[in-house]
């Protein structure tokens, strides 16, 4: 059947709700009433393709209807003089140097990864790459921040085993990313049982483009031709955005059908083809066919340019020849790009597509006016006002701020810190990520200067940020870091988000760069609940306040709601991807100790608070009070560490696992031990000083020959000399009493193999 009419004008409220459920539209009663009223005004009943197109455009995933009000309120006007495009197209664009710009974006692929972990994660990588490519940029780096369930437990109330999800997600990222030739260089992995049924897969991509080759995601002029380039169109991914805009309840045939099928062997030539065409200057506009498929891509692109479109689906190459018109229109089949060219350039674009063995279809024409018409087999299946399609309802949802009591629960001190330390380094959230990251190719393209690990051969440790050299003839580099602190945000959404951003800044600064831009992926539960909406609003407010304070542009973002299962929400998880600039990549710093007899300094005021720390959580303490980070102190750290970089041999921020894990990881990268005394850090208990994770602290390794200059120049900051490097043991004392004395290798062995049983 090509199409059928739906008699919506005669439907009552119950009929409208039943129709929304029956067709998988995920529209509310009020939204269905608005659709009914539109067609009453038009004097006709809709065709099925029109109803599905509206549902796609009005989905939470595509329209941001629950978040747009607050995003505009708090994140507008966060541009800088070096911002080229922010919150306008498929990705953000920021100046790199006088001739080039870098392009960046982060997206979530959460619901698909919960139902089909391998495929969901793989298509998340493919989609984020196309978001960057459609701006005309060559992808140069992939990023993925993963939030997984409790893989250590065999008991779970979830759709799938958390361990199965974890292994599938990593496998999907590995197989897609490695096959398209883009290095996977940065990210994070965090574990908590709240993610058992709702894993979070936040994928990011960075690209590089000449400024005169930036492509917009909005139509250029009437008369241009719309083309479809890439893979074939099938039934995979139908209603994908509707599925991602609702609460996950069970795995069904419809939910599996909503998962897109990725094919990196098509993605790579598609990427090469459109970049080749862009280099020739024939692409006037371009948009990735991701969520919502052709329906969303075509509607959004022509509407953004102030035009309409006349489209025919007859030339589209199909996987299933019996597909109906509405299925073709909303299919979310992957590896497809909507391209706009001048009429005289159609044949040239076709030649390029055929050269790369890609499917090529002529869709139609950009026209004056605000109407979109779509035909299939000589039948008109869509004839609608684009403004109605693209202007989904915007909700100012009510919210309640969390009432945070200023109380802190203090866990008891370990009886034996040596035994405790050996167990602590092997915990899921402290252990090495080698088992995950070594599956990814992080050196392809030959531009990775500092990878996700750094250190001496066979003694690598975690990097704070990675460093990419995008251009062959320039030493200027990009620094990349990504992650979230849901353990903090769940206690205090505002201060916890500030802590997430503070850590990102310290990661960039520790590696030798200066923060330059921000993108986010905001993952929360059901926005129809006021407490969840309160988490979201406070988190977005924090991002706005922080970025204004530090003059950082927020250039792109993504919101993922409805991450709940059986009324259990995930921890609020605002993931931040931050990019920094370094003028000379040869000056980049790494995290591992470089030599014996170096002086170890702690920079920044101690937070002295265990709330949200891994130490507290392993003692089953999940509440508390989180002090706001001192942002003025952080600004001074950026200035001083950047200005006096030659004094610093290595640096590592204090975050997950506290001061203890920061020092241990610095030791793990070279095998060089250390001897420190906690007495000068603060007056708090030893466990608080060792395992507190909040605040702005950074550990610095200082060459003794520069120590005098260092202390003089850093006198405006809180700095404490806590010890020196040397030997092959980790020795921690306090006021002359020994607390920890262990071989570096013994601790490293536990840390390195912490994930072995799970992946």
Swiss-Prot record:
Binding site for Mg(2+) 2: 131, 288
Chain residues that bind Mg(2+) 1: 107, 558
Positions of ATP binding: 64, 105, 520, 557
Compartment(s) where it occurs, according to its Swiss-Prot or TrEMBL record: Cytoplasm
Molecular function via GO: ATP binding; magnesium ion binding; phosphoribosylformylglycinamidine synthase activity
Catalyses which reaction(s): N(2)-formyl-N(1)-(5-phospho-beta-D-ribosyl)glycinamide + L-glutamine + ATP + H2O = 2-formamido-N(1)-(5-O-phospho-beta-D-ribosyl)acetamidine + L-glutamate + ADP + phosphate + H(+)
EC numbers on record: 6.3.5.3
Main enzyme class: ligase
Matches recorded under InterPro entries: PRibForGlyAmidine_synth_PurL, PurL_linker, PurM-like_C_dom, PurM-like_C_sf, PurM-like_N, PurM-like_N_sf
Protein's job: Part of the phosphoribosylformylglycinamidine synthase complex involved in the purines biosynthetic pathway. Catalyzes the ATP-dependent conversion of formylglycinamide ribonucleotide (FGAR) and glutamine to yield formylglycinamidine ribonucleotide (FGAM) and glutamate. The FGAM synthase complex is composed of three subunits. PurQ produces an ammonia molecule by converting glutamine to glutamate. PurL transfers the ammonia molecule to FGAR to form FGAM in an ATP-dependent manner.
Name of protein: Phosphoribosylformylglycinamidine synthase subunit PurL
Organism: Thermoplasma volcanium (strain ATCC 51530 / DSM 4299 / JCM 9571 / NBRC 15438 / GSS1)
């Amino acid at each position: 059947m090509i199409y059928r009419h739906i008699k919506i004008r005669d439907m009552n409220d119950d009929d409208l709700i039943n129709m929304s459920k029956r067709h998988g539209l995920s529209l509310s009663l009020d939204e269905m009433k608005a659709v009914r009223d539109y067609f009453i005004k038009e004097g006709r009943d809709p065709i099925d393709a029109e109803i599905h197109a509206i549902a796609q455009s009005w989905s939470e995933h595509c329209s941001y209807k629950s978040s747009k009000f607050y995003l505009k309120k708090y994140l507008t006007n966060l541009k800088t003089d070096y911002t080229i495009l922010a919150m306008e197209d498929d990705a953000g664009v920021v100046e790199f140097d006088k001739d080039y710009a870098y392009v960046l974006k982060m997206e979530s692929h959460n619901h698909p990864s919960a139902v089909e972990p391998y495929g969901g994660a793989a298509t998340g990588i493919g989609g984020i790459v196309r978001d960057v490519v459609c701006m005309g940029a060559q992808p140069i780096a992939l990023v993925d921040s993963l939030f997984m369930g409790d893989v250590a437990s065999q008991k779970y109330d979830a759709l799938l085993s958390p361990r199965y999800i974890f292994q599938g997600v990593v496998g999907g990222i590995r197989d897609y990313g490695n096959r398209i030739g883009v290095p996977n260089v940065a990210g994070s992995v965090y574990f908590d049982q709240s993610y058992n049924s709702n894993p979070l897969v936040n994928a990011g991509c960075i690209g590089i483009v000449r400024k005169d080759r930036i492509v917009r995601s909005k139509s250029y002029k009437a008369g241009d031709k719309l083309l479809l380039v890439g893979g074939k169109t099938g039934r995979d991914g139908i209603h994908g955005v509707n599925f991602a805009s609702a609460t996950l309840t069970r795995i069904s045939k419809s939910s599996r059908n909503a998962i897109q099928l990725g094919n990196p062997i098509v993605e790579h030539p598609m990427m090469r083809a459109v970049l080749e065409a862009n280099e020739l200057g024939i692409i006037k506009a371009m948009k990735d066919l991701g969520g919502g498929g052709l329906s969303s891509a075509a509607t959004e692109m022509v509407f953004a340019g102030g035009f309409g479109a006349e489209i025919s689906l007859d030339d589209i190459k199909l996987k299933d020849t019996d597909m109906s018109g509405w299925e073709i229109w909303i299919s979310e089949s992957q590896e497809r790009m909507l391209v706009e060219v001048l009429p005289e350039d159609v044949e040239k674009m076709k030649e390029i597509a055929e050269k790369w063995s890609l499917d090529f279809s002529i869709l139609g024409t950009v026209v004056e006016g605000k109407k979109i018409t779509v035909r299939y087999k000589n039948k008109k299946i869509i004839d609608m006002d684009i403004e109605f399609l693209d202007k989904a309802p915007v909700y100012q949802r009510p919210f309640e701020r969390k009432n945070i009591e200023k109380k802190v629960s203090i866990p008891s001190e370990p009886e034996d810190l040596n035994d405790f330390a050996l167990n602590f380094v092997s915990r899921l959230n402290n252990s090495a990520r080698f088992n995950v990251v070594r599956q990814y190719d992080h050196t392809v393209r030959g531009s990775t200067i500092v990878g996700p690990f750094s250190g001496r051969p066979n003694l690598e440790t975690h990097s704070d940020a990675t460093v990419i050299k995008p251009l062959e003839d320039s030493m200027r580099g990009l620094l990349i870091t990504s992650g979230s602190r849901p353990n903090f945000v769940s206690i205090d959404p505002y201060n916890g988000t500030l802590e997430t951003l503070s850590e990102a800044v310290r990661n960039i600064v520790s590696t030798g760069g200066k923060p330059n831009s921000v993108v986010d992926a905001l993952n929360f539960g059901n926005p129809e609940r006021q407490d969840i909406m309160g988490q979201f609003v406070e988190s977005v407010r924090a991002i706005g306040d922080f970025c204004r304070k530090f003059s950082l542009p927020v250039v792109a973002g993504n919101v993922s709601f409805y991450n709940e299962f059986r009324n259990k929400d995930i921890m609020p998880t605002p993931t931040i991807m931050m990019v920094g600039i370094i003028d000379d990549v040869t000056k980049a710093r790494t995290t591992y100790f470089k030599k014996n007899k170096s002086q170890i300094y702690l920079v920044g005021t101690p937070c002295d608070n265990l709330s949200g720390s891994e130490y507290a959580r392993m003692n089953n303490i999940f509440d508390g009070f989180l002090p706001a980070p001192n942002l003025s102190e952080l600004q001074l750290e950026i200035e001083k560490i950047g200005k006096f970089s030659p004094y610093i041999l290595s640096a590592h921020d204090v975050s997950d696992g506290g001061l203890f894990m920061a020092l241990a990881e610095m030791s793990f990268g070279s095998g060089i031990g250390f001897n420190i005394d906690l007495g000068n850090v603060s007056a708090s208990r030893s466990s608080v000083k060792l395992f507190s994770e909040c605040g702005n602290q950074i550990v610095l390794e200082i060459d003794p020959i520069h120590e005098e200059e260092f202390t003089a120049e850093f006198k405006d900051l809180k700095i404490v000399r806590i010890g020196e490097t040397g030997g092959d043991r980790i020795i921690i004392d306090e006021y002359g009493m020994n607390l920890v004395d262990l071989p570096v290798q013994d601790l490293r062995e536990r840390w390195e193999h912490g994930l072995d049983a799970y992946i």
